[in-house]
């Protein structure tokens, strides 16, 4: 079971490396890793399990954050509707690639955080509002999905991890809250 002690922190060189492609068909080891990553995210969002296991809440996790330089990401985004228990996006992506993106940019009003970053980093992280992503699932099936808004932001954050990019690399160094005209701010 993955816990916070398994997650490496900023400064570790694995977080700045471009991760290796995962062989398809997916090996049992890589499938299990993906499953464990998704379980961590689900546990981190369950108040009882999160407290019991001392987990910080997360919606995404990339293999490099576990000091494993492979192109594997897991995302578990809860529904916006409090009545709906079904997550809006819950999957493991092997070798995800952004095929296309919108011209429209977006950012979270509260900024972004990261399980590998133990400090608050204020500022807007500007990303594409809509993306089309291809990836392989645990069974080795290829998928192509269109994502927008928060789901697109989460997946871009995790894909950055497999490319050696941290969220704060996107923040304007001179003026962290400067935005170009037309950027949507999601609260």
From Swiss-Prot:
Described by its record, this protein's role is as follows:
Removes the formyl group from the N-terminal Met of newly synthesized proteins. Requires at least a dipeptide for an efficient rate of reaction. N-terminal L-methionine is a prerequisite for activity but the enzyme has broad specificity at other positions.
Check the record and name the PANTHER family matching this protein.
PEPTIDE DEFORMYLASE, PEPTIDE DEFORMYLASE 2
E.C. number, please? 3.5.1.88
- UniProt-listed SUPFAM superfamilies: Peptide deformylase (SSF56420)
Name the family the entry cites.
Belongs to the polypeptide deformylase family.
Kindly give the HAMAP family that the UniProt entry links to this protein.
Answer: Pep_deformylase (MF_00163)
Q: What does this protein need as cofactor?
A: Fe(2+)
The answer, when asked if Acetylation is one of the entry's keywords, is no
Q: Which organism is it from?
A: Enterococcus faecalis (strain ATCC 700802 / V583)
Matching entries from NCBIfam families are given as:
pept_deformyl
Q: Which biological process annotations from GO are given for this protein?
A: co-translational protein modification; translation
Q: Name one GO molecular function term.
A: metal ion binding
Q: Where is the active site?
A: 158
Q: What is this protein called?
A: Peptide deformylase
Catalytic reactions of this protein: N-terminal N-formyl-L-methionyl-[peptide] + H2O = N-terminal L-methionyl-[peptide] + formate
Q: Any idea which positions bind Fe cation?
A: 114, 157, 161
Q: How is the cofactor bound?
A: Binds 1 Fe(2+) ion.
State one Pfam family annotation: Pep_deformylase
The alphabetical list of record keywords is:
Hydrolase, Iron, Metal-binding, Protein biosynthesis
């Amino acid at each position: 079971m993955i816990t916070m002690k398994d997650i490496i922190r900023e400064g570790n060189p694995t977080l700045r490396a471009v991760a290796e492609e995962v062989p398809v068909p997916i090996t049992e080891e890589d499938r299990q890793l993906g499953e464990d990553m998704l379980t961590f995210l689900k546990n981190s969002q369950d108040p009882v399990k999160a407290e019991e296991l001392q987990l910080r809440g997360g919606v995404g996790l990339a293999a490099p954050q576990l000091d494993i330089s492979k192109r594997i990401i897991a995302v578990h985004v809860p529904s916006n509707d409090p009545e709906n228990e079904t997550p809006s996006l819950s999957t493991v992506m092997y070798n995800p690639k952004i095929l296309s993106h919108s011209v429209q940019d977006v950012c979270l009003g509260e900024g972004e955080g990261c399980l590998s970053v133990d400090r608050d980093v204020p500022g807007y992280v500007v990303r594409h509002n809509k993306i089309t992503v291809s990836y392989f699932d645990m069974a080795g099936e290829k998928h192509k999905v269109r994502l927008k808004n928060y789901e697109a932001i989460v997946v871009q954050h995790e894909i950055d991890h497999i490319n050696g990019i941290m969220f704060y690399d996107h923040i304007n160094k001179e003026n962290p809250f400067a935005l170009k005209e037309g950027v949507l701010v999601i609260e």
